[in-house]
Amino acid sequence: MQHPPFYKSCRRALFGLFVLSMTAPACLAGQVSVEVKGDYPALQDNAEAFMQEIEGRSEAGLRRYVSTAKGQVQTALKALGYYEPVIDWEILKPEGDEGPAQLSLTVEPGKPVLVRSRKVEIMGPAGDDPAFNLFLPSKPVVGDVLDHGQYNALRQTIQNLASRLGYFDGKFLTRRLAVNPEEHAADITLEFQSGERYRLGDVRFIEGHGFETSLLNQFVTFESGGVYHSDKIAKLSSDLSNSGYFSSVDVDATPSSAEGGVIPVVVALRTRPPRSIAGGVGFSTDVGPRLRGNWREHWINPMGHRRGAETELSQPRQNVSVWYELPLDPPMTDSIRFSAGYQQEEIEDVESQLLTVGQQWNHQLDSGWLQTASINWEQERYRFGDGSTDQSRLLLPGLGYSLLEADSAFDPSKGYHLSLEVTGAHRALLSDADIAHVLASAKGLYTVADNHRFLTRLRVGAVATNRFSDVPPSLRFFAGGDQSVRGYGYETLSPENSEGVGLGGRYLLVGSMEYQYEFAK
């Protein structure tokens, strides 16, 4: 295909655009400065980006460099649609012969080149694919000042979409940006033939991983024979990596291995060490110094079962727990966990020893909410103040929902967490009391200008019972502490009896808002 001379010249070396948020009237690159007249911050920035730093040149050397410097400025302005700048220059001699001479360039941008026509045609099956057309850039549009960066982005986006959606045989039939500086006009023509969309074949796991194939197949969320999408491959790799079973995951779905437009998916897995131990020492204003430790067996059989033990020791609270977990389908989100634990706690006027044995079923709904159905048997011995020791035995079925949305799993700058939990017990079902317990909470985080963080919390709860004195401390409400009401001791706020002993509340309503400023990262 033959292109006019002005098109060939415009394709040379134009296409870097470095845009800064602050502008300056002139750029000083060693012995060379450039100033774009008028209110053209983008042109000024691009001229600065293209200008080479020159040092150690004599006055004669600077004169020889003028044509090179003017060429750099012209290239920078062409990239943003200004093909006919007027560039004046002068050599500035230092006063008293102190310091080197300076080459000063002054630029009048002139009249810009405008987009006169835009023809973008996607031929083949991709032309009728909403997923392809939805993400095509709208820029540049007819009437815009020509921006080579936008043209390149449009062209590159078409190629990227084809690769992402599986149109691997796609190619440009016409790819032309015709610029006529005399008419100050540019014509864009992009004709892309997509070819047929590839499909994904069967997933094969290379032997040696030690797991049941039936378990691994539950990580595959796409159907064999379905259309290719790179996100499907990325999700499979991510889910396997985040499962906790493997130290490395390699998912191969290269188009070159396709047969008849169907790409086989081959997965190579390296199993992680089965066990890990972690421990740590910390301090919080709620419980003071504390010691934490956990032991975890990440997989104990080919079905992917796992188990672990955890403990936390501090002056007011000591606990230990063990658990055993079975993955369900899909194993990324769904599981059944059996657990048992013992906790001893002494805070202000309340002493408690709590033994818990139970089961949890976790299931993620299509809406993104995590649903948890549980049933726990709890035996608690407790005492308020100097009173006598009481004991409760409760069988507590429960249902909970939680939702977490955040822009990062590790250090979020904004997001929220919502939860609702309902549990209950009845004397007719192996329990010492009739209880309905409801607790809802909401947390929100929002960051402004990187360093200013706003954190809000809200907790609402209630206990319905015909005899509140039978409700153990673990099901009553207390407030106070870093995660509740700052300025008060941990769980020291509650209704009191005539002797000033905190008894815990039947209802809870706690809200707070915090402002945090980050001085250094």
Question: Where are each of the predicted segments found?
Answer:
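Bacterial N-terminal signal peptides that target proteins for export
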Residues: 2-15
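Periplasmic polypeptide-binding modules associated with outer-membrane biogenesis and secretion
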Residues: 29-42, 52-285, 294, 308-326, ...
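Transmembrane beta-strand segments that form the barrel wall of outer-membrane beta-barrel proteins
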Residues: 220, 275-285, 293, 297-299, ...
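C-terminal outer-membrane beta-barrel translocator/porin domains of Gram-negative envelope proteins
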Residues: 242, 390, 394-521
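Outer-envelope beta-barrel architecture signal
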Residues: 261-263, 273-277, 289, 303-307, ...
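Outer-membrane beta-barrel strand-turn architecture
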Residues: 271-273, 299-301, 328-330, 363-367, ...
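Solvent-exposed loop/turn segments connecting transmembrane beta-strands
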Residues: 283-290, 311-320, 345-354, 384-391, ...
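Transmembrane beta-barrel wall of Gram-negative outer-membrane proteins
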Residues: 320-393, 397-399
